[in-house]
UniProtKB/Swiss-Prot annotation:
UniProt-listed Pfam families: RRF
Record keywords: Mitochondrion, Protein biosynthesis, Transit peptide
Primary localisation category: mitochondrion
Keyword Protein biosynthesis: yes
Gene name in the database record: RRF1
Name used for this protein in its record: Ribosome-recycling factor, mitochondrial
MF terms in GO: ribosomal large subunit binding
Length: 257
């Protein structure tokens, strides 16, 4: 019996040794939750901070931006001025020998007043203007329109064609040449310095670009970068002003020779 008791005690000892040992130190765990109100406040606080930072960045970027000038657009407009003046300069060189001399006349027809170009067209043949009348019923009306103008010309019906009027070209005199040159200079000044958008002068285009440029920056004094941009535009304006002057002088010499 003593042997059985010993075995029982040994088995109990082994069993006790195999049981897991639980530490006596306990760390309490607490579930942490953020209330909706606190979360909203934290989000709002962070949002305001980000918004402020973005605003500062945008202000810095605005300060660093250099006002821009559309050089392509300005160049195209300057070219348009040169082209329009060149056309008028060519007409001035022809003076009263230009076939367009009658184009602005108003003709009184049976259907009322109409423009010259709607009832006739003009060409130059030798030392004569040849006016072709579209409707024979308007021949007399066109003759009266020419006689009533300040052109000092006397159209005659061509015997070989009743719908054709022959008008001798006026002789070119020194006085008429000087007058043509004077009129051309007035046109030149209008295309160069004329005011008003309707005139489309180089000065008007420059003024529009300058005003738009100045509105893009709020500082009274231009920065170095801004100064460079505007100086480049001023060079472009001068370049086309010189071109306009060249066209004028060339046409003036052709008129006076």
């Amino acid at each position: 019996m003593l042997r059985l008791l010993t075995r029982s005690q040994a088995f109990r000892a082994v069993t006790l040794c195999q049981r897991p040992i639980i530490s006596s130190r306990c760390i309490p765990i607490r579930n942490f939750q953020i209330s909706p109100i606190l979360a909203k406040k934290n989000k709002a606080k962070g949002g305001n901070k980000n918004k402020s930072e973005v605003q500062e960045i945008e202000e810095d970027n605005t300060d660093n931006q250099v006002p821009e000038i559309d050089f392509d657009d300005a160049t195209n407009k300057f070219k348009g001025v040169i082209e329009r003046f060149s056309k008028q300069a060519n007409e001035a060189k022809l003076g009263k020998t230009s076939p367009n001399i009658f184009d602005k006349l108003i003709v009184e027809t049976a259907n009322g007043e109409v423009g010259f170009t709607s009832v006739a067209q003009t060409t130059v043949k030798g030392r004569n203007f040849m006016i072709t009348v579209f409707d024979p019923s308007n021949v007399k009306s066109i003759i009266n329109a020419v006689l009533g103008s300040d052109l000092n010309m006397n159209p005659q019906i061509d015997p070989s064609n009743k719908q054709t009027l022959k008008v001798p070209l006026p002789p070119l005199t020194t006085e008429s040449k000087k007058e043509n040159a004077k009129q051309l200079k007035l046109v030149y000044e209008r295309f160069k310095n004329g005011s008003g958008r309707a005139n489309g002068s180089l000065a008007t285009i420059r003024g529009d670009v300058k005003n738009k440029f100045q509105k893009q920056h709020k500082k009274k004094k231009l920065s170095d970068a801004e100064e460079k941009v505007f100086k480049d535009f001023e060079k472009l304006h001068k370049q086309y002003t010189d071109k306009l002057t060249e066209v004028f002088k060339s046409a003036e010499q052709a008129i006076l020779k």
